[in-house]
Amino acid sequence: MVADSRQVALSHTAGLSLPQQTQMSLFASFALLDAENTYKKRMQDMIHERLHTLWESTGFTLLDDPLRAGYYSEIDMLVWAKKFYGDDFVEYLKKNYEPLDVVFRLAQETSLVLLNGGGFDAPEWSIRASLANLKREDYVRIGEGIASILHSYAQRWKESLDK
């Protein structure tokens, strides 16, 4: 049985509905039957691979975090803007663009829709990628797209300095 929790949530308005109770019972039963956690380990490995694929594609460095759940990855564009180009470039970004510009442009260029992290109590200029539901190749496209966007903004900034 496959059930998308978002679809289940859309099917009711409040409280635990029968589909949710059934789904939770099936998940709990499956967890009890899989004593060696084979499925769980396989899914954790898949998420881990997607996380590293995303970050390797950006060219940015993924810092170790023992508390990382791995379901989402947040990339703070201002951190990487500062690291690669300095504080003046960060100020240029803040003055000339909005935090949502990056995710809109990413959607236009890659046809992949991500959310900015500001709505999830993350840094305003961060991009939030779910690691749970896309193919490995999609994370390559996302990572390369994020890096390309940052570098194209830097190119515009450098051109503005020459004027």
Outline where the language-model segments fall.
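PLP-dependent class I/II
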Residues: 1-163
